[in-house]
């Protein structure tokens, strides 16, 4: 053997090894495209590697530093191997590389983990009755993020994947905690149990970055439990009386339920019953409100920085939500008070699916006074309210609510001196409201509510006089006079609202609506008849010149986003668009809403806001208390919409456990406000209401201080308001065109409310109110005008000043 032959041996060996390696590489290159079919659920990396190694000829090589953050869930059907690896390692800090029959796994360097986020959503309800809880607080302990339930008890919060701890709290309920690993979108419904030991509740609107209302200022949430514990006249718990005790809110006349908020008039308050406006909220000339306490679940008051979803009034929004009804068991209450009696019944129609809630109230002043009435004079007054609601749960995604309210005041006076002369009158006024609402959850981030409603307010007066006498010739003459006056407003509305949580940093609300108005401002009919021995001498019907109805159409749209900038600043930016069409006239308004909240530290917060509002309806009133003669009228070609610009700034301190301190200042500029002209009266004038009023402007400013104790056996609040409200009308008009104090301008106001709980059954409360007097203009002259006998308004007397 030659040496040369030995030299060729390594060469042949290398060639052979190379051919084998090349063949092997080609073989495994083909295996890359091997199609796999398998199903994995919550598998570990080790389990995944074993599956691939058994299904292919590859082996994995990786160090201890390589690991997966998420369990592997994958269903593959004829999927190439490289696509399987791409899918599994897409959101992991792992890279892979083929090397012959090996798959090398390496840790990605210099890259931050891709944090997946999932959404938790659901309803928060009472554990006993399944009643939804509005404004329940939800906070995540690790991320320090939170939210609140919306007006239908629904919440949605998006959090990073991993260990999660949610705390659910609500006034009067034991705090619920849920701990779990968040690895997917989760539906989590919470049933909270009542807690008679009213421990402190986490109010995240001031202490955490959560919820749309947290950014707004001038908002107060009042649970029904707080309203029932607030002292009131004659022991009747009343929604409006409780609101009167808040800073910035004035009462018209002592004891009445009228509201004058931050220098505004009563018609500038948007009062909603389950989302439907209520035009008359008073009984007994303002000493009671129309809201039966047993029917109410929660009340929210907005004095400034109104959310974009609200519009149509200048001064405030009062959102009253009623009870849905117990889905688990039947129960009820019956109570007898000094002036009223009430009954409330609720329970399941289909257990766990459908419930009802019915309440009724009636006064019995007429029954108490009847024994003391003289035989020839009869007076009667009473009022009543009826609420009914049906709540049906189609599924966790879909719910339907049907609501109805009817309330009325009735007054009658009859005189029957003898058989020849009789006269009398009766008045009735009240509301009828019917609404249907449908909640639907499109997904865990998008919630919708659709509302269709009917609303009617009517004031009706009937008077009559019968006079019968005999002539000297023996003829019997009968004179009869009767009249009917009525005014009112009827609304048909459609509204759809959406609640969207795209990311943890954004909470978006948007929607649109249509409202049809029918106004009857001033309708009078009079009938005069004369008979002689049953022979008709005259039978004439008169109508005033203002019997025409006014139809109006209102279209609205809005959008708002509550979002976070950095760790301290949160903004709420919104826009409300409204279009009002009446008498061939269009009024278009763009109303920006801006609110900001800056967290100086964990205890101190500063808020600021700007709000523009427009109002297309007016309430004409000449009395200091709520009267049925108050007239609702729309804007017209002559009467322009009211508008306002409000600026507010506030500071809040929550550093003392169980206490909250706040100070808020505001300035509001108002245009096109209405007042009756000097010397005019509502009754007895043949001219239309447009000729009785004049437009002007107003301004109000004030500062409000409040200290509130929210925890412990003794709770309550102390508030002080310093405010000023002025009006100015055209030169030559009211006060000769000079600025003058508004009739409900009260410079100083102090409210103190205290409640102490001795035990589960015994508690005591007290309230004290101090305010400076209002302003009033005293008439200097009185004139009596008697209409001609053959006039259209025969029988009316007009008293002017």
Model-identified regions with their sequence ranges:
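Gram-negative outer-membrane beta-barrel transporters
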Residues: 567, 667-669, 691-780
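Transmembrane beta-barrel wall of Gram-negative outer-membrane proteins
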Residues: 337-362, 375-410, 426-454, 503, ...
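Short, acidic Ser/Thr/Gly-rich low-complexity loop/linker segments typical of extracellular
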Residues: 143-154
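Structural signature of Gram-negative outer-membrane beta-barrels, strongest in the C-terminal barrel
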Residues: 489-491, 503-507, 513, 546-670, ...
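Surface-exposed extracellular loop regions of Gram-negative outer-membrane beta-barrel proteins
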Residues: 410, 458, 523-525, 603-647, ...
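Short, acidic, small-residue-rich periplasmic hinge/interaction motif at the N-terminus
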Residues: 49, 53-56, 92, 98-141, ...
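Outer membrane beta-barrel strand-and-loop segments of large Gram-negative receptors
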Residues: 491-493, 546-550, 556, 640, ...
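Periplasmic N-terminal accessory/gating domains of Gram-negative outer-membrane beta-barrel systems
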Residues: 172-174, 202-267, 273-306, 317, ...
């Amino acid at each position: 053997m030659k040496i040369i032959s030995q030299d060729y041996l390594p060469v042949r060996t290398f060639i052979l090894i190379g051919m084998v390696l090349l063949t092997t590489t080609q073989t495994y290159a083909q295996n890359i495209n091997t199609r796999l079919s398998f199903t994995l659920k919550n598998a570990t990396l080790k389990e995944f590697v074993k599956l691939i190694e058994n299904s292919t000829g590859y082996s994995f090589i990786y160090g201890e530093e390589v690991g997966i953050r998420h369990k592997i869930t994958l269903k593959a059907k004829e999927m190439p191997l490289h696509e399987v690896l791409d899918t599994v390692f897409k959101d992991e800090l792992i890279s892979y590389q083929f090397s012959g029959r090996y798959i090398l796994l390496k840790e990605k360097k210099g890259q931050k983990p891709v944090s997946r986020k999932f959404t938790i959503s659901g309803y928060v309800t009472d554990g006993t009755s399944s009643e939804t809880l509005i404004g329940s607080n939800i906070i995540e302990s690790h991320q320090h993020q939170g939210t609140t339930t919306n007006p239908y008890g629904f919440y949605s919060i998006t959090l990073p994947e991993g260990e999660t701890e949610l705390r659910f709290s609500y006034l009067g309920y034991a705090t619920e905690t849920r701990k779990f690993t968040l690895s997917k979108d989760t539906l989590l419904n919470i049933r909270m149990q009542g807690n008679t030991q009213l421990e402190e509740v986490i109010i995240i609107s001031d202490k955490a970055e959560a919820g749309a209302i947290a950014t707004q200022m001038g908002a107060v949430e009042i649970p029904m439990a707080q309203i029932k514990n607030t002292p009131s006249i004659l022991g009747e718990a009343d929604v409006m009386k409780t609101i009167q005790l808040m800073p910035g809110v004035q009462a018209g006349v002592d004891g009445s339920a009228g509201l004058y908020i931050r220098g505004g008039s009563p018609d500038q308050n948007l009062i909603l019953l389950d989302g439907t406006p209520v035009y008359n909220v008073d009984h007994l000339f303002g000493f009671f409100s129309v809201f039966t306490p047993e029917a109410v679940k929660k009340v929210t008051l907005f004095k400034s920085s109104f959310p974009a979803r609200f519009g149509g009034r200048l001064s405030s929004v009062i959102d009253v939500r009623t009870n849905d009804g117990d889905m688990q068991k039947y129960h009820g209450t019956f109570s007898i008070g000094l002036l009223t009696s009430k009954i409330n019944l609720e329970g399941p129609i289909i257990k766990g699916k459908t419930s009802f809630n019915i309440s009724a109230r009636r006064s019995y002043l007429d029954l108490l006074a009847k024994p003391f009435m003289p035989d020839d004079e009869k007076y009667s007054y009473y009022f009543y309210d009826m609420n009914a609601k049906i709540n049906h749960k189609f599924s966790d995604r879909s719910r339907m609510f049907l609501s109805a309210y009817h309330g009325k005041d009735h007054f009658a006076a009859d005189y029957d001196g003898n058989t020849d002369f009789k006269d009398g009158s009766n008045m009735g006024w009240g509301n009828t409201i019917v609404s249907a609402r449908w909640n639907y959850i499109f997904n865990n981030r998008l919630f919708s509510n659709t509302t269709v409603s009917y609303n009617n307010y009517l004031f009706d007066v009937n008077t009559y006089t019968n006079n019968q006498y005999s002539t000297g010739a023996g003829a019997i003459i009968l004179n009869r006079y009767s009249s009917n006056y009525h005014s009112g407003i009827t609304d048909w509305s459609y509204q759809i609202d959406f609640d969207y949580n795209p990311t943890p940093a954004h909470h978006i609300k948007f929607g649109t609506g249509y409202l049809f108005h029918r106004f009857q401002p001033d309708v009078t009919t009079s009938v005069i008849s004369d008979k002689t021995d049953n022979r008709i001498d005259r039978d004439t019907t008169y109508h005033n010149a203002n019997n025409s109805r006014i139809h109006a159409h209102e279209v609205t749209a809005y959008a708002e986003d509550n979002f976070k900038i950095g760790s301290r600043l949160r903004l709420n930016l919104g826009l409300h668009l409204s279009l009002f069409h009446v008498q061939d006239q269009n009024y278009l308004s763009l109303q920006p809403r801006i609110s900001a909240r800056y967290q100086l530290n964990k205890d101190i917060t500063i808020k600021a806001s700007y709000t523009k509002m427009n109002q297309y309806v007016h309430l004409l009133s000449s009395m200091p208390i709520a009267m049925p003669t108050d007239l609702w009228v729309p804007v017209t070609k002559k009467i322009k919409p009211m508008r306002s610009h409000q600026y507010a700034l506030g500071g809040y301190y929550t550093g003392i456990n169980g206490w909250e301190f706040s100070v808020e200042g505001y300035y509001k500029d108002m245009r096109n406000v209405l007042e009756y002209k000097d010397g005019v009266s509502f009754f007895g004038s043949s001219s239309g209401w447009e000729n009785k009023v004049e437009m002007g402007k107003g301004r109000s400013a004030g500062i409000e201080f409040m200290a509130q104790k929210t925890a412990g056996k003794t709770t309550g609040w102390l508030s002080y308001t310093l405010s000023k409200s002025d009006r100015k009308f055209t030169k030559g008009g009211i006060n000769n065109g000079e600025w003058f104090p508004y009739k409900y301008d009260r410079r100083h106001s102090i409210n103190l409310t205290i409640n102490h709980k001795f035990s589960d059954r015994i508690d005591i409360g007290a309230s004290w109110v101090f305010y400076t007097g209002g302003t009033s203009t005293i008439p200097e002259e009185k004139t009596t005008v008697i209409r001609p006998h053959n006039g259209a308004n025969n029988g009316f007397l007009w008293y002017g000043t």
